[in-house]
């Protein structure tokens, strides 16, 4: 219960109500605890290094612990490419400050971040298919309610416990 997978997904444009700016994009940041499958979600108008740092700080508050490891893909919100040699990415600075190991998966291998990728497919099926919103605040409010439900859905991989129940079970052993 100390390893996270983090990723970002686009919020489908079909969710935005007609009177809203269609050029506007929204992004869902997702953090999943690998042991419990408990998730934290938060939405932004951009996927940037600064928002990544903000998201990790929010996730630490949500989970109430600092992970030992975080695994991400190689998106610019998580790491710099070779053109930034010599510069330290803001996420890596935060990880260093908090003594978190940052693992980056090999390029073009999203299956290596499979838990968070699968959770994004579930979000499309369970949430975005039925969602409509006009503002970022409305998206965040509806998303928070969805997150509460999501962490209370039994999962076969957890022996039909919910992510919240699995976390309680693991914490009772420590």
What are these regions, as identified by a protein language model?
Residues 37-42, 103-105, 129:
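Short small-residue beta-strand/loop micro-motif enriched in glycine and branched aliphatics
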Residues 1-30, 38, 54, 62:
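Mobile-element integrase/transposase regions
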Residues 73-74, 82-85, 89-95, 101-125, ...:
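RNase H-like two-metal-ion nuclease catalytic core shared by retroviral integrases
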Residues 8, 34, 46, 74:
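Residues immediately flanking
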Residues 2, 98-100, 122-174:
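C-terminal domain-tail junction helix/linker
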Residues 1-12, 76, 89-95, 162-171:
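Basic, flexible linker segments flanking DNA-binding modules
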Residues 24-25, 41-65, 69:
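Active-site beta-loop-alpha junctions of metal-dependent nucleic acid enzymes
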Residues 37, 70-73:
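Buried hydrophobic side chains on well-structured beta-strands
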């Amino acid at each position: 219960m100390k390893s996270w997978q983090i990723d970002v997904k686009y919020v489908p444009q079909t969710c935005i109500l007609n009177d809203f700016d269609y050029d506007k994009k929204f992004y869902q940041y997702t953090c999943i605890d690998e042991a419990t499958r408990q998730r934290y979600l938060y939405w932004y108008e951009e996927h940037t290094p600064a928002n990544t740092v903000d998201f990790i700080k929010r996730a630490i508050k949500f989970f109430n612990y600092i992970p030992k490891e975080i695994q991400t893909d190689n998106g610019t919100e998580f790491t710099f490419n070779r053109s930034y040699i010599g510069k330290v990415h803001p996420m890596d600075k935060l990880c260093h400050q908090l003594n978190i190991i940052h693992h980056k998966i090999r390029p073009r291998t999203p299956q290596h971040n499979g838990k968070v990728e699968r959770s994004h497919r579930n979000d499309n099926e369970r949430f975005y298919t039925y969602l409509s919103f006009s503002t970022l605040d409305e998206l965040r409010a509806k998303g928070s309610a969805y997150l509460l439900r999501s962490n209370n859905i039994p999962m076969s991989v957890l022996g039909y416990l919910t992510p919240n129940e699995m976390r309680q079970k693991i914490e009772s052993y420590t």
